[in-house]
Amino acid sequence: MRDKVVIITGASSGIGKALAYELAHQGAKVVLAARNIEELLHIEQDLRQQGAEVLSVRTDVTKELACKELIEQAYARFGRIDALINNAGISMRALLEDLEPAVLRKVMDVN
């Protein structure tokens, strides 16, 4: 993965965060994307201290414009994108009959 540019959505926690650390340790240039910019910046700082090249972009994957801005910022910083890991996701626990349509729409939009 050395010098590959990888975008990871959902990078502020869980699997996305773990992927960011692993890929950075393998030499990838990592673009962190998530709604929680504070956590992204914390991860970015930690990875930079370890010698990684990192860019954090606040991104709501349910918004088309935010996704376009993510791609544009990645290209502006690194000049290319080699891989996109669509890791952002949310879940819900409810019976379908009890579910509000807006909640279902949000789950579908993110996932």
Regions found by a protein language model. Give the residues of each.
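Conserved glycine-rich cofactor-binding loop
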Residues: 12-13
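A glycine-rich helix->loop->beta "capping" turn
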Residues: 52-53, 73-86, 92
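Conserved glycine-rich Rossmann-like NAD(P)H-binding loop of the short-chain dehydrogenase/reductase
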Residues: 26-43
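A conserved hydrophobic alpha-helix of the Rossmann-fold in NAD(P)-dependent oxidoreductases
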Residues: 40, 67-74
